[in-house]
């Protein structure tokens, strides 16, 4: 039976190291002797229910660890469920009862170290690179045991589309990239090409691939993985030369201006490209060469294949300028830098420089790397370390961190990001903080204090080592990461939300909270946020936006500002200014003023804001309005808030809720769910926008209707139903945040309960 271990310490202190005793670390372990017959039956039922309903509910409810925690804590929901009938008015007691039920359930899900565990996956291209890399390096069986393989296969079978392919994420239609790499993953894991025990998964996948032109229509990142495996030729790839890291700072795009995920990916990938590395051929590799192309492998024109991309994968068609750019880079990289004498004078030096960067970034993040995409696609880092020296400590340190990325759900094993521990904990604490009152019981008090302890121990207390600016790193001291302190790469909104929580605890009496956080650490957090504000008033996520944009560069290439991060930062800094007016008061006020203007300038014609990290316009509007309100704006004095409220009212469905499709993200316009269904996460966010916009004082009916949806959606145990996927990054790649169904629903109920009490 699989079990989740929290704060798992290193079994091998040589290759795994920590900055804070592994606080927040989440590791799944299989124990063949664990679990009673009843517990095992419960797990199997959850798996069976997901598989049977996978065509209707694509995202897992993340049940396995929840069942484990509820058993361990002997949780029993004793408060009866509230049901609001059609003609019935919601009373204050109804709302408070529903909130109380949800808080008791949510409290039981908190880990002993204070954070809330959760899956953070959802994207279908996360598993295969790990499998391919471990296969190439000969460590597949060591890392992925039989039990791991069973769950890997379960995940791929569960998320294969009806047409035989796989999409970019669990709700996505099939594309070439994910279909090819998942097909290869199945074959590496021992599934035969023509038949298997799951309705010929390989045969159906191969048919989809061949029907859509074959693997030469994979995008660049897919072609790179096929090249290192030896089932594609590097000459059919767009160039990723290691000499890129030599570009001076005055170039429009250089190592320092790249978006951090792209930088981490291209570090390892450019080394492999520059080395022209290809895995040792095996019988399976030779078979794959014949299975994923419609023509014989030896007949493929790699030059013609270089610019191919399936229409299903082509989110941003390449412009004429981009065509010229890539052709120029290819000529320079392959016809000049890769030939004598330049290959000795420049290429070898570039390879050494690239690996210096790889090692620096790996060490600075304790081999967790810069984020979900870098570690998953830039398993390239791990592979580059192995190519450099298969016996190196660098490679062994990467292997030691692989368990940090494994997550087990009822739908199988998925490689996730390194975790969303800090983000989930800060947002979860907001629920308890906003619902805080003087008669709080000991259970809620304990939840608050454990969460505070986790945040305090997870703050980044030092900048990266050495001359970090030279290595394309930036100030980190004072920030909070997305996950834990070991990862070491702070994010602005995670910092802002965590700082806001810490300011609440700072305002509490010592009798309630005990020892408080060092005030200097709060100052450090403020400094970090101030550092990230751009001239336009917006705030970036990881590093200042110093990219020099040109026509052919998408915003996925360089760092830029985000409305959600800006809104969160305004909330935290406005509260900080109230509690600590003596620290950088003018700078903080200037930040808020500029941030408000940035938010107002970014508002869409319909009154919404585009959400970069969640689905999508409702998500962005929630964080934008929250920031405006914290800055002193309200419905009466702010046109932007009035327009935002109108957008929310206009998109409310007949049930009284809201449901937004993930398609809003790539299409950049509001798209409701099919059938105008309700999603409780969107509904919670929209409900809070209405309350912040003083809708209760003008016409409370839309608010009551939304609250009724949330209250009636609550399940017998206090949980809320898992529905559509609600996280995203870079418009196309969806991420699964299953705890959102608890956070945003309960947070909304705290707002609603307070609003009822104030009537």
Swiss-Prot record:
Keywords (A to Z) from UniProt: Isomerase, Repeat
Annotated organism of origin: Arabidopsis thaliana (Mouse-ear cress)
Keyword match Ligase: no
The organism's place on the tree of life at top rank: Eukaryota
Any Pfam family: SQHop_cyclase_C
Keyword Isomerase recorded: yes
Gene Ontology cellular component annotations, sorted alphabetically: lipid droplet
Gene Ontology terms describing biological process: tetracyclic triterpenoid biosynthetic process
Family per similarity comment: Belongs to the terpene cyclase/mutase family.
Protein name, per record: Baruol synthase
Enzyme Commission no: 5.4.99.57
Protein task: Converts oxidosqualene to baruol (90%) and 22 minor products.
PANTHER family: ARABIDIOL SYNTHASE-RELATED (PTHR11764:SF49), TERPENE CYCLASE/MUTASE FAMILY MEMBER (PTHR11764)
Gene Ontology MF term list: baruol synthase activity
Renumbered ranges of PFTB repeats: 149-190, 522-564, 641-682
Catalytic reactions on record: (S)-2,3-epoxysqualene = baruol
Active-site residues, Swiss-Prot/TrEMBL: 493 (proton donor)
């Amino acid at each position: 039976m699989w079990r989740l271990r929290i704060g798992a310490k290193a079994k091998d202190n040589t290759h795994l190291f920590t900055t804070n005793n592994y606080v927040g670390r989440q590791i799944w372990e299989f124990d063949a002797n664990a679990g009673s017959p009843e517990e095992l039956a419960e797990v199997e039922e959850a798996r069976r229910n997901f598989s049977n309903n996978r065509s209707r509910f694509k995202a897992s409810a993340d049940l396995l660890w929840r069942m484990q925690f509820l058993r361990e804590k002997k949780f029993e929901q004793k408060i009866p469920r509230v049901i609001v009938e059609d003609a019935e008015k919601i009373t204050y007691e109804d709302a408070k009862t529903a909130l109380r039920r949800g808080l008791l359930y949510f409290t039981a899900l908190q880990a002993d170290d204070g954070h809330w565990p959760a899956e953070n996956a959802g994207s279908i291209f996360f598993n295969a690179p790990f499998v391919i890399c471990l296969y190439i390096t000969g460590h597949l069986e060591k890392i992925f045991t039989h039990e791991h393989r069973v769950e890997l296969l379960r995940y791929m079978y569960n998320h294969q589309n009806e047409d035989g392919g796989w999409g970019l994420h669990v709700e996505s239609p099939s594309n070439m990239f994910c279909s090819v790499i998942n097909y290869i993953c199945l074959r590496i894991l021992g599934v035969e090409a023509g038949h298997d025990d799951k309705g010929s998964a390989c045969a159906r996948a191969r048919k989809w691939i061949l029907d859509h032109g074959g693997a030469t229509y994979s995008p660049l990142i897919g072609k790179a993985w096929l090249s290192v495996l030896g089932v594609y030729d590097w000459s059919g790839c767009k160039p990723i030369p290691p000499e890129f890291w030599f570009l001076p700072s005055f170039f429009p795009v250089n190592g320092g201006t790249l978006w951090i995920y792209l930088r981490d990916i291209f570090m390892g990938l450019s080394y492999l490209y520059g080395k022209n590395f290809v895995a040792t051929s095996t019988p399976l590799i030779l078979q794959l060469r014949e299975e994923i192309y419609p023509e014989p492998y030896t007949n493929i024109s790699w030059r013609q294949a270089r610019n191919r991309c399936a229409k299903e994968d082509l989110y941003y068609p390449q412009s004429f300028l981009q065509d010229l750019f890539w052709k120029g880079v290819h000529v320079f990289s392959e016809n000049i830098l890769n030939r004598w004498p330049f290959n000795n004078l420049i290429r070898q030096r570039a390879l050494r420089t690239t690996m210096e960067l790889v090692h620096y970034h790996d060490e600075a993040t304790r081999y967790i790397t810069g984020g979900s995409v870098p570690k998953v696609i830039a398993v390239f880092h791990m592979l580059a370390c192995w190519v450099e020296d298969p016996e190196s400590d660098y490679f062994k340190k990467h292997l030691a961190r692989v368990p940090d990325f494994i997550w087990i759900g009822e739908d199988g094993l998925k490689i996730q990001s390194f975790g969303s521990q800090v983000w989930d904990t800060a947002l979860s604490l907001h629920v308890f903080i906003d619902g805080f009152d003087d008669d709080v019981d000991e259970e809620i008090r304990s939840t608050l204090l454990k969460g505070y302890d986790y945040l305090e121990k997870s703050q980044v207390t030092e900048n990266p080592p050495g001359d970090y600016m030279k290595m394309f790193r930036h100030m980190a001291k004072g920030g909070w990461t997305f996950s834990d302190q070991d990862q070491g790469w702070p994010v602005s909104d995670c910092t802002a939300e965590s700082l806001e929580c810490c300011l609440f605890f700072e305002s509490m009496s010592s009798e309630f909270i005990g020892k408080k956080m060092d005030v200097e650490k709060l100052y450090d957090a403020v400094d970090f946020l101030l550092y990230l504000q751009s001239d336009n008033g917006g705030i970036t996520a990881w590093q200042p936006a110093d990219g020099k944009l040109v026509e052919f560069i998408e915003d996925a290439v360089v760092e830029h500002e985000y409305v959600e991060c800006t809104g969160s930062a305004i909330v935290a800094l406005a509260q900080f200014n109230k509690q600590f007016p003596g620290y950088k008061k003018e700078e903080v006020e200037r930040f808020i003023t500029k941030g408000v203007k940035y938010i107002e300038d970014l508002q869409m014609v319909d009154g919404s804001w585009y959400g970069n990290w969640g689905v999508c316009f409702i998500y962005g509007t929630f964080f934008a309005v929250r920031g405006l309100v914290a800055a002193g704006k309200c419905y009466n004095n702010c046109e932007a808030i009035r327009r935002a409220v109108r957008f929310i009212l206009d998109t409310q469905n007949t049930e009284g809720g809201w449901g937004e499709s993930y398609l809003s993200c790539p299409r950049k316009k509001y798209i409701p769910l099919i059938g105008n269904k309700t999603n409780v996460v969107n509904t919670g966010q929209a409900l809070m926008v209405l309350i912040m916009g003083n809708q209760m004082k003008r016409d409370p009916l839309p608010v009551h209707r939304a609250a009724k949806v949330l209250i009636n959606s609550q399940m017998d145990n206090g949980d809320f139903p898992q529905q559509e996927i609600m996280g995203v990054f870079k418009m196309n790649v969806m991420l699964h945040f299953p705890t959102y169904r608890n956070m945003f629903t309960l947070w909304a109920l705290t707002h609603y309960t307070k609003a009822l009490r104030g009537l």
